[in-house]
Amino acid sequence: MSAEYGQRQQPGGRGGRSSGNKKSKKRCRRKESYSMYIYKVLKQVHPDIGISAKAMSIMNSFVNDVFEQLACEAARLAQYSGRTTLTSREVQTAVRLLLPGELAKHAVSEGTKAVTKYTSSK
């Protein structure tokens, strides 16, 4: 596991370096990923199993790819109906179109549950 889990840094921040140095080092830009969330889900499902950095990278690429496919499909659906705003309806339809059978049903129910929880907390 790397030090990136659970830590946030303000964009454009100094990253803890002193400004007194004459030589300016290249600023370390934080790379956003789903690693922390993938790891948490893994521990919920299989608490005794770990994951290698290579496998984590593959999983992160997979999540990014699925997210991009869903976003593109939802945007296409909104465009077809002449709308400029993505709603949960477009996202739900995109999930039904892209994911197979039982996986789509579970994804829709979990998504509905998450939206309900979010709206009730406001």
UniProtKB/Swiss-Prot annotation:
Modified residues (N6-succinyllysine): K31, K113, K117
Entry keyword annotation includes Transcription regulation: no
Modified residues (N6-malonyllysine): K113
CDD domains registered for this protein in UniProt: HFD_H2B (cd22910)
Residues recorded as bearing Phosphoserine in the entry: S33, S81
List of residues that carry N6-lactoyllysine: K40, K105, K113
PTM sites of type N6-glutaryllysine: K31, K40, K43, K105, K113, K117
Residues with Omega-N-methylarginine modification: R83, R89
Ranges where the record places region Disordered: 1-30
Modified residue annotations for N6-(beta-hydroxybutyryl)lysine: K31, K113, K117
GO cellular component: nucleosome; nucleus
Ranges of Basic residues composition bias in the record: 20-30
Entry-annotated residues carrying N6-(2-hydroxyisobutyryl)lysine: K31, K40, K43, K54, K105, K113, K117
Keyword vocabulary terms for this entry: Chromosome, DNA-binding, Glycoprotein, Hydroxylation, Isopeptide bond, Methylation, Nucleosome core, Nucleus, Phosphoprotein, Ubl conjugation
PTM-bearing positions, type Phosphothreonine: T112
Modification type N6-methylated lysine: residues: K113
A Pfam family hit: Histone
Modified residues (Dimethylated arginine): R76
Covalent link Glycyl lysine isopeptide (Lys-Gly) (interchain with G-Cter in ubiquitin), residues: K31, K117
Subunit: The nucleosome is a histone octamer containing two molecules each of H2A, H2B, H3 and H4 assembled in one H3-H4 heterotetramer and two H2A-H2B heterodimers. The octamer wraps approximately 147 bp of DNA.
Known role: Core component of nucleosome. Nucleosomes wrap and compact DNA into chromatin, limiting DNA accessibility to the cellular machineries which require DNA as a template. Histones thereby play a central role in transcription regulation, DNA repair, DNA replication and chromosomal stability. DNA accessibility is regulated via a complex set of post-translational modifications of histones, also called histone code, and nucleosome remodeling.
Family: Belongs to the histone H2B family.
Protein name per UniProt: Histone H2B type 2-K1
